Design a protein with these regions (language model features):
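Membrane-interfacial loop-to-helix junctions in multi-pass inner-membrane proteins
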Residues: 86-94, 145-155
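Hydrophobic alpha-helical transmembrane segments in multi-pass integral membrane proteins
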Residues: 55-105
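Non-cytosolic membrane-interface motifs at loop->transmembrane helix junctions
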Residues: 117-127
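N-terminal membrane topogenic signal
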Residues: 21-37, 92
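Juxtamembrane "helix-exit" motif on the non-cytosolic side of transmembrane helices
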Residues: 47-53, 107-116
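Alpha-helical transmembrane segments of multi-pass inner-membrane proteins
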Residues: 32-40, 45-47, 67-75, 101, ...
């Protein structure tokens, strides 16, 4: 019996069909998804709204909601004109995502703060946001394509975010993100929490940069040429991680690097790595 890799098992049934079997409506779905991905990579990390860190979570939430709603409406229109929701029978990825949603529904139903679970009590990470995450994951798995431009756009976003963060570390307040004339150095004294860059608090910034570094370094080394410039935002990200005092990032960073290991292996060794990471 032929072996199937873990990656193929998880994505079976949600990857785009081959080009020759795609209808015009499905190609429009692919085009919309391409623009959706670019929009998220370019705008979401950098958008800060109009009230600085005081309202940053809400600004990013409504941006994500608006962009996702426009994309979903476009996809729905394409589905009404001939595009198929699945290229073939739904695979494990689809059912795992549905299980994720069911888990969130059960959690919300059993929560003693049930009335606050829909949006997330000011943090905007509630049930509605989890639904958007699932919609994004399934849509990109179905109509997304692997493109180098995505890494380049993400690298540009990381560069700009880190440039703002470095300015703040040096004592500045670009974009007026800190209120009342405060600075990054005032964290823990004049205000609670730590905020840096255009992402928000340093914990979230650390998670984003921890994911970015291995992706940017891998792409730069593999593609070479002008893509070696991606090493610049990667280096900036490492320095910002160090100065942000986000200790959890130094746990997340090795984990993110481990996720890149299957890209460096082939054949049986790659299957072993995928199995180990899945376990």
């Amino acid at each position: 019996m032929r072996e199937l890799s873990a990656a193929k098992l998880l994505t079976e049934g949600v990857h785009p069909m081959e080009e020759r079997s795609m209808t015009k409506a499905e190609k429009r779905c692919e085009w919309l998804t391409d623009k959706y991905i670019l929009c998220l990579l370019a705008l979401f990390p950098l958008f800060t709204g109009f009230h600085g860190y005081a309202n940053l979570a809400a600004a990013k939430f409504w941006l994500y909601t608006g962009v996702t709603a426009l994309w979903a409406l476009g996809i729905a229109a394409c589905l009404c004109t001939g595009a198929r929701l699945f290229a073939k029978k739904p695979g494990a990825f689809f059912y795992l995502t549905c299980a994720f949603l069911v888990w969130n529904l059960v959690s919300a139903a059993l929560s003693p703060w049930r009335e606050k679970t829909f949006l997330g009590a000011g943090r905007y990470d509630g049930l509605f946001t989890q639904f958007l995450y699932a919609l994004t994951a399934l849509g990109i798995a179905r109509w997304g394509r692997k493109k180098i431009i995505y890494v380049r756009v993400f690298g540009a976003s990381v560069f700009l975010c880190c440039a703002v963060a470095l300015w703040q570390i040096a004592g500045g307040n670009p974009l007026g993100l800190y209120p009342n004339g405060w600075r990054f150095a005032d964290a823990g004294t004049l205000y609670s929490g730590m905020y840096l860059g255009t992402v928000g608090n340093t914990l979230i910034l650390g998670s984003v940069l921890s994911l970015a570094v291995p992706v940017l370094v891998y792409t730069a080394v593999k593609k070479r040429g002008y893509d070696l410039l991606l090493l610049l935002p990667a280096a900036m990200a490492l320095y910002v991680l160090y100065r942000s005092e986000c200790s959890s990032a130094w746990v997340a960073l090795p984990g993110s690097c481990a996720l890149m290991l299957p890209k460096l292996a082939r054949g049986r060794r790659r299957r072993y790595i995928l199995a180990a990471e899945g376990a």
